[in-house]
Amino acid sequence: MLNVLILGVGQCGNRILDAVNKEAMGGGGASKIAKYCLKPKFPSRVETVAINTAINDLKELRYTTAKDRLHVPNLHGMGANRNVGKQAFMDNRDSIMGEIEKRGDFDLAFVLTSTSGGTGSSFSPLLINELKRQYPNITVVTVAILPFREEGSIYLQNAAFSMRELMELDADGIILADNQYMKRFSGDIASAYDKINSTIAQRLLFLIESLDSEMLSVTDLGDFKTVMNGGLRIGTMGYYQADGKNSSVKDAIENSLKPNNLLYPANVADDAARAMVIIQGSRELLDVDQITKEV
């Protein structure tokens, strides 16, 4: 069984993590009190921790239990100041890593974070360094969220510095999601947030399940790491679910790469150095030879 750690850092990371827990509890059918009476059903052994300096951001989480929330004392957040955020992380490094360490060993960690805010963009590079130091054999992948352009110059500047630091790390790759790009398919900003968070959560859970399941062609953590280590070590995720109307394998693959099914604007066919194609369905409908040909 795969041992997975999912860390949501800062407000953006917290909300995506909460969406992950919601999906693991049953998606749209999960009620507001689900966290008190239900346990998320993950495909692997998954531990989740929401980390934030703003206690009010942690309080608003609806599907993440209190034991999975870590408040780093610093009044009410970083106010988009990355320098203050870095100092806050260093001041509280031992308690943060202690909270993670008591949850056991892990094969794979996802760090969910905005690149533009204060806590997420400043904590995440330092946190990833500590994870690689404390768990030498762990695979660490960042799910990095680029800001809406309307958020302003400070947030765009933070994103530039944060991305540079993330790319310089000795980690295993970055999965990019662009809020501005995905807003095109979600309407206005207010309604886009929930849609974007749930979209990322669904794809992340699908990926985890695929890395820890019996398949016609084995796809495991080593394969995922090889793909993420290709090129610039930056990737995105596409997803498509057939509606049951005689959708072919070719159609499924092509649809998963269409702009409205990607988290980031990319010409995958022309620009990708490596790719992993995961197809889930009934065995009688999956022909390995056909899949190999289409890929």
Residue ranges and their predicted role:
Residues M1-V295:
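Tubulin/FtsZ superfamily GTPase core signature
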